[in-house]
């Protein structure tokens, strides 16, 4: 399965800055009924720990345009508490995905927009995103415009 363009467009426009890789995993499980093939421990450009999820041809972080660096061995020890916390969250989400979505307002809103927004509107938002990025316009401005 390829990365879903509608979902990426919504994540990068109307929901920019609101979602995490855990949220993306939950959305993929809810919308596409797919579980991740692999879990990757990573850090972002600021050195903050983040869990990433690998699917067939993409990672959850790609929906958010995040560049994450995988960590191994001793680096994992440094982030042990964050790893435990995020793995526990992932397990809770996987245990009852429907309940998790129901109790998370931004994910409920995302799914509603994903299901109800027309392809034309999402395509228009994606086009705005491409133009804005080419001109160097900030994501926050794009989010407000969509």
Curated annotation (Swiss-Prot):
Keyword Membrane (UniProt): yes
Domain of life: Viruses
Membrane-spanning residues: 10-32
Family assignment from sequence similarity: Belongs to the chordopoxvirinae H7 family.
Role, per record: Contributes to the formation of crescents and immature virions (IV).
Name of this chain's protein: Late protein H7 homolog
Keywords assigned by UniProt, alphabetized: Late protein, Membrane, Transmembrane, Transmembrane helix
Organism: Rabbitpox virus (strain Utrecht) (RPV)
